């Protein structure tokens, strides 16, 4: 347990300095001020430090701390003398302290604005970014207390510590005196130091999500012997997906003689498992979760998916349970997806993880999906599956007590298997950070967002984050400036995801429209104008146009340097006998694919009415097309991509909506967050048969990426044409 803070005779315990941090390898830890109650922890910590690290700290052999040392290192006034510790499981793994000094290096008080700083990290935790995190936090504390410079003495052989100071990004001076390196750091933040902090944050948070999505072993806690339970369902879905790692079933109610369940080892507790467990899926009643979390922490589990309900969605008592759940998990260095989560999926061939309640694992694809609602997650998975689209990863975070959409953006920025990031968000816990991360991610791959609870002004049950008071129009403007594609409905998100995952991004706003229906072409033209695109006058092929005419017209449009994208509109054509034909979708699909076979770098979308089999034929061709070639690393993108797109302040509610070519289609309705039966249904008052949802026009490249469009060799192979 953490010590109870005491009051200093000089200054109250600064509880606002406490913070949970994500380390370089994705694990979590807590940083807090050291108190007088930490004497035993400090001694135990020091005993686990190697003689070499002790020598680097004190410049001499120093096998143990004296009573005087312990008193000095645990008694602080939190103004002139401050000590911080990094803890995991309540125990120290690293410490830092500063002492205010005058210009002669003697102990001093304000207005002296320089302090001597010293670090010590357990050898087992060196290389995890502990010292860098401590430096970032102790620098913030020092600035709060009026300190402007740090002085440090480092032995020349202590390369790790020298590197920590050098890489921090602060303005610094270095000299060599009396056999040691003397460093002076100006603590005023610089562009470089801020970039370093954000880079550390990005890598750590991305790695923490990656550890959850690619575990080498999974234990399902609460998998019962009776089929149909939540835990048993997760276990069976895990096995049905072909998970490549080790799986275990854990339930304290198992008979002692039970050796296996569904073909995997069965245990009554995690302690019975001799091997490392990376991920635990907890599916037990809420009152049993603390015991399960403690078992996971003691066993060294790296992350948790808590599908158990009964937390913040139940009211004030549940919110307190949820806060305690997060505190408990983080004290052991574990991150949480949930509680009340639907689960996670990773379709990578070397993982094949389906630790969720989704009965069928989606096909492998290039779309990453994050949802806060399990019901909306089901609708999105179903919609993508019906359209033949696959996923790279899926996270349904439930109450989103820990892992959030911001973490997913950090992961998506890094993930080479993801070309498009889709997010269904019901609340924005940190809008400023979300905008910053979305801008950076959108600079390297499209980000599509549906924002629920737009007008209610309240968070959904279970989301214990402050209610955002930002008007919805402002949210739209922020997203647009960040390069985010905001859509209104789940159906539009599916449409946009499929289009962006299978097509190159347009290099500009110019759109060519061609088809055999003048009316449908004009509707498409108007829709493009409404979205700020620059459509060319529609090319009317007339109702007598054959599939070959479509092929020739599309090939000509793709070769035209004055357009950046093409929309094909089609209705049943008139045959040689003068009779309208229902249309052979496979014939038209083949003709369109022939047109793009030459290697076009422009996106092509098809809007059709009652042409049987066209959508299926195009989807089948798309499923066999090569994935988009990724740049060697996403980190080559600037950390803060600029945007030059003007956002009209009087049209922010409409500018981010993906507009269907037929504005009466019901897919433009708001999707209720508690219903999944209607989210993907298409009805159309202007059609006798709604064979497919109305199409959004190909979205222009997000604002941030426009300055650096993908090179032709980085674009997908032609032939991936979506139909709507």
Where are these regions (language model features)?
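Long, contiguous binding/interaction regions
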Residues: 1-204, 208-210, 215
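Catalytic-core regions of core metabolic enzymes
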Residues: 188-645, 649-653, 667, 673, ...
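Periodic short-repeat tracts
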Residues: 659-660, 666
